Amino acid sequence: MHVHEAALRWTQVWTTGWARQDAEAIVELQAEDGVHWSTPFDSPHRGRAGLRKYLQDAFASEVEPTRARFAAPLVQGEQAAAEYWALCRYDSGPLTISGCTMLRFDTRGLVVESWDYSYVIPGHVPFPFDW
Protein backbone atom coordinates (compact mmCIF):
# COMPACT_ATOMS: atom_id res chain seq x y z
CA MET A 1 0.00 0.00 0.00
CA HIS A 2 1.29 3.47 -0.87
CA VAL A 3 2.18 5.53 2.22
CA HIS A 4 -0.08 8.44 1.23
CA GLU A 5 -3.05 6.06 1.00
CA ALA A 6 -2.14 4.49 4.36
CA ALA A 7 -1.76 7.89 6.04
CA LEU A 8 -5.07 9.14 4.67
CA ARG A 9 -6.78 5.96 5.87
CA TRP A 10 -5.16 6.47 9.29
CA THR A 11 -6.61 10.01 9.60
CA GLN A 12 -10.06 8.85 8.49
CA VAL A 13 -10.17 5.91 10.90
CA TRP A 14 -8.93 8.06 13.79
CA THR A 15 -11.58 10.70 13.05
CA THR A 16 -14.45 8.23 13.25
CA GLY A 17 -12.80 5.85 15.71
CA TRP A 18 -12.17 8.56 18.30
CA ALA A 19 -15.77 9.82 18.05
CA ARG A 20 -17.14 6.27 18.38
CA GLN A 21 -14.54 5.20 20.94
CA ASP A 22 -13.75 2.33 18.59
CA ALA A 23 -10.40 1.13 19.89
CA GLU A 24 -10.41 -1.95 17.65
CA ALA A 25 -10.71 0.05 14.42
CA ILE A 26 -7.70 2.14 15.46
CA VAL A 27 -5.70 -0.86 16.71
CA GLU A 28 -6.13 -2.58 13.32
CA LEU A 29 -4.11 0.24 11.74
CA GLN A 30 -1.02 -0.77 13.74
CA ALA A 31 1.41 -3.57 12.93
CA GLU A 32 1.41 -6.42 15.47
CA ASP A 33 4.75 -5.23 16.86
CA GLY A 34 4.11 -1.52 16.30
CA VAL A 35 5.04 1.03 18.96
CA HIS A 36 3.04 4.13 19.91
CA TRP A 37 4.28 7.00 22.08
CA SER A 38 1.27 8.97 23.37
CA THR A 39 3.74 11.37 24.97
CA PRO A 40 7.52 11.62 24.69
CA PHE A 41 7.80 11.58 28.49
CA ASP A 42 6.25 8.16 29.25
CA SER A 43 6.97 4.62 28.17
CA PRO A 44 5.61 3.68 24.75
CA HIS A 45 2.60 1.43 24.18
CA ARG A 46 4.04 -1.71 22.59
CA GLY A 47 2.19 -3.92 20.15
CA ARG A 48 -1.49 -3.96 19.43
CA ALA A 49 -2.25 -5.00 23.01
CA GLY A 50 -0.40 -1.97 24.38
CA LEU A 51 -2.17 0.42 22.03
CA ARG A 52 -5.54 -1.20 22.81
CA LYS A 53 -5.02 -0.75 26.57
CA TYR A 54 -3.99 2.89 26.11
CA LEU A 55 -7.04 3.64 23.95
CA GLN A 56 -9.47 1.83 26.25
CA ASP A 57 -8.16 3.79 29.25
CA ALA A 58 -8.29 7.09 27.35
CA PHE A 59 -11.81 6.48 26.04
CA ALA A 60 -13.06 5.40 29.48
CA SER A 61 -12.12 8.80 30.89
CA GLU A 62 -14.17 10.70 28.28
CA VAL A 63 -17.70 11.68 29.37
CA GLU A 64 -18.91 12.37 25.81
CA PRO A 65 -17.62 11.53 22.34
CA THR A 66 -14.62 13.54 21.18
CA ARG A 67 -14.98 15.58 18.02
CA ALA A 68 -11.70 15.50 16.11
CA ARG A 69 -10.51 16.75 12.75
CA PHE A 70 -7.31 15.84 10.96
CA ALA A 71 -5.49 17.78 8.26
CA ALA A 72 -4.40 16.05 5.09
CA PRO A 73 -1.27 14.09 6.01
CA LEU A 74 2.15 15.18 4.81
CA VAL A 75 4.08 12.23 3.42
CA GLN A 76 7.73 11.60 2.63
CA GLY A 77 9.12 8.14 2.04
CA GLU A 78 7.69 5.71 4.58
CA GLN A 79 6.78 8.49 7.02
CA ALA A 80 3.83 10.81 7.44
CA ALA A 81 2.71 13.61 9.74
CA ALA A 82 -0.92 14.35 10.54
CA GLU A 83 -2.02 17.47 12.42
CA TYR A 84 -5.24 17.28 14.45
CA TRP A 85 -7.63 19.35 16.55
CA ALA A 86 -9.88 17.64 19.11
CA LEU A 87 -12.66 18.83 21.39
CA CYS A 88 -12.89 16.48 24.39
CA ARG A 89 -14.91 16.42 27.60
CA TYR A 90 -13.84 14.75 30.83
CA ASP A 91 -15.13 14.81 34.43
CA SER A 92 -12.79 17.75 34.99
CA GLY A 93 -14.40 19.66 32.11
CA PRO A 94 -13.88 20.38 28.43
CA LEU A 95 -10.44 20.36 26.80
CA THR A 96 -9.10 21.30 23.40
CA ILE A 97 -6.17 19.31 22.04
CA SER A 98 -4.05 20.61 19.19
CA GLY A 99 -1.53 18.04 18.09
CA CYS A 100 0.47 16.25 15.46
CA THR A 101 1.17 12.55 15.08
CA MET A 102 4.34 11.41 13.35
CA LEU A 103 3.93 8.01 11.68
CA ARG A 104 6.11 5.38 10.04
CA PHE A 105 4.44 2.70 7.93
CA ASP A 106 5.48 -0.75 6.72
CA THR A 107 4.91 -2.00 3.16
CA ARG A 108 1.42 -3.26 4.09
CA GLY A 109 0.38 0.23 5.17
CA LEU A 110 0.40 -0.58 8.89
CA VAL A 111 1.90 1.74 11.49
CA VAL A 112 5.20 0.47 12.90
CA GLU A 113 5.98 3.61 14.91
CA SER A 114 3.92 6.62 15.93
CA TRP A 115 4.65 9.60 18.14
CA ASP A 116 2.08 12.11 19.42
CA TYR A 117 2.97 15.69 20.24
CA SER A 118 0.15 17.82 21.57
CA TYR A 119 -0.84 20.96 23.41
CA VAL A 120 -3.90 20.86 25.67
CA ILE A 121 -5.88 23.80 27.04
CA PRO A 122 -9.04 23.97 29.18
CA GLY A 123 -12.28 24.75 27.38
CA HIS A 124 -13.43 24.21 23.84
CA VAL A 125 -11.79 26.36 21.19
CA PRO A 126 -13.67 26.10 17.87
CA PHE A 127 -11.91 24.42 14.96
CA PRO A 128 -9.74 27.19 13.49
CA PHE A 129 -9.14 25.50 10.14
CA ASP A 130 -11.44 24.20 7.43
CA TRP A 131 -10.02 20.70 7.24
List each language-model region with its residue ranges.
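Short hydrophobic/aromatic segments of transmembrane alpha-helices and their interfaces
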Residues: 33-35, 94
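Hydrophobic pocket/interface hotspot
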Residues: 14, 26-27, 34, 47, ...
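Short N-terminal micro-motifs specific to bacterial/archaeal maturation
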Residues: 17, 41-42, 71
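A short gly/proline-enriched turn/hairpin at secondary-structure junctions
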Residues: 35-46, 61
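Alpha-helix C-capping/helix-to-loop hinge sites
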Residues: 13-17, 36-37, 87-88
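A beta-strand edge to alpha-helix "cap/lid" segment located at domain peripheries
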Residues: 1-2, 6, 53-131
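Short, low-complexity N-terminal intrinsically disordered segments enriched in polar/charged residues
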Residues: 1-32, 129-131
